[in-house]
Amino acid sequence: MKMWRHLDMNNIIMKLEDIDKFYMETGNKLHILRKLNLEVKRGEFVSILGKSGSGKSTLLNIMGLLDKIDGGKIWIDDKEVSSLNEMERNNIKNHFLGFVFQFHYLMSEFTALENVMIPALLNNFKNKTEIEKEAKELLEIVGLAERMKHKPNQLSGGEKQRVAIARAMINKPKLILADEPTGNLDEDTGELIFSLFRKINKEHNQSIVVVTHARDLSQVTDRQIFLKKGVLE
């Protein structure tokens, strides 16, 4: 296994340095992200905004090590991770990152409680009894103490997304990344989801980065960043 390069970033949980990303489209090379630089502090709640096609989701995928970069460096919790192989990247994702997407991706045959437990069971970090106890506590945090035994088809859209948030927290990630988490929800439910993120951020000192097109909802975050033509403003 490669040795990680360390960077003394003190209060920085993630740093992107001179990130370039290209895509090929009908024979044309598109420069999606251009020498992009970003730092996220520990315990910070950050929103990334931009027009459709601005590269917001690409940026979040790069932060989550779901997509590779074409130039630059990525640092997570003072370790350089941009040059790691696939197995090492997966290890970082499992230990340091939590993900929430626009669609909840809950498994229909399992209850809310079981869905939250799955990532921890797969990683085999703890025994099943401990995992179940922590999953119940997380469902209480997101306001679903009475819905633990319900399956996804018995939950509302907002409740499903709250289960997804609890699932993202089960492995105690250093950073939660959320890609348009309110995109499929009505305005009132979207506000509840952002309020929940803020509560988790404040009460648990959880670092969160959320990509959204909803500028009004992003007002509750510590910092708003705008992505335009591959550059942060």
Swiss-Prot record:
One of its GO terms (biological process) is transmembrane transport. GO terms for cellular component: plasma membrane. It holds the Pfam family ABC_tran. Signal peptide: none annotated. Residues 14-233 form the ABC transporter domain. It is found in: Cell inner membrane. Keywords: ATP-binding, Cell inner membrane, Cell membrane, Membrane, Nucleotide-binding, Translocase, Transport. It comes from the Bacteria. Its EC number is 7.6.2.-. The keyword Cell membrane applies. The keyword Lyase does not apply. ATP binds at residues 50-57. It is a peripheral membrane protein. GO terms for molecular function: ATP binding; ATP hydrolysis activity; transmembrane transporter activity. Belongs to the ABC transporter superfamily. Lipoprotein translocase (TC 3.A.1.125) family. PANTHER family: ALPHA-D-RIBOSE 1-METHYLPHOSPHONATE 5-TRIPHOSPHATE SYNTHASE SUBUNIT PHNL (PTHR42798:SF7), LIPOPROTEIN-RELEASING SYSTEM ATP-BINDING PROTEIN LOLD (PTHR42798). The complex is composed of two ATP-binding proteins (LolD) and two transmembrane proteins (LolC and LolE). Part of the ABC transporter complex LolCDE involved in the translocation of mature outer membrane-directed lipoproteins, from the inner membrane to the periplasmic chaperone, LolA. Responsible for the formation of the LolA-lipoprotein complex in an ATP-dependent manner. This is Lipoprotein-releasing system ATP-binding protein LolD. The gene is lolD.
